[in-house]
Curated annotation (Swiss-Prot):
Belongs to the scorpion calcin-like family. KTX subfamily. May inhibit voltage-gated potassium channels Kv1.1/KCNA1, hKv1.2/KCNA2, and Kv1.3/KCNA3. May also increase intracellular calcium release through the activation of nuclear inositol 1,4,5-trisphosphate receptors (ITPR) of cardiomyocytes, thereby causing an increase in the contraction frequency of these cells. Residues 1-16 form the signal peptide. It comes from Lychas mucronatus. This is Putative calcium channel toxin 196. Keywords: Calcium channel impairing toxin, Disulfide bond, Ion channel impairing toxin, Knottin, Neurotoxin, Ryanodine-sensitive calcium-release channel impairing toxin, Secreted, Signal, Toxin. The presence of a 'disulfide through disulfide knot' structurally defines this protein as a knottin. It is found in: Secreted. Its main location: secreted. The keyword Metal-binding does not apply. GO terms for cellular component: extracellular region. Disulfide bonds join 25-38, 31-43, 37-52. Residues 17-26 form a propeptide.
């Protein structure tokens, strides 16, 4: 029974991490894609690395 409890707790923690993903992203955080950033930011290159930045627009 205790193994199931551990698995349950792990799945809850993992789900919480995924659910909290967009809220903990901040401006200038390193990213691999736009999904790593909040909706108002985009994953843009500043020369060396990609970071979450405001979309400069068209």
């Amino acid at each position: 029974g205790s193994l199931l409890l551990v698995l349950f707790l792990l799945s809850v923690i993992c789900y919480a991490e995924i659910a909290a993903g967009p809220t903990k992203c901040q401006y200038g955080r390193p990213c691999d894609s736009d999904r790593d950033c909040c909706w108002e930011y985009r994953c843009l290159s500043s020369g060396e690395e990609y970071t979450c930045k405001q979309d400069p627009g068209p």
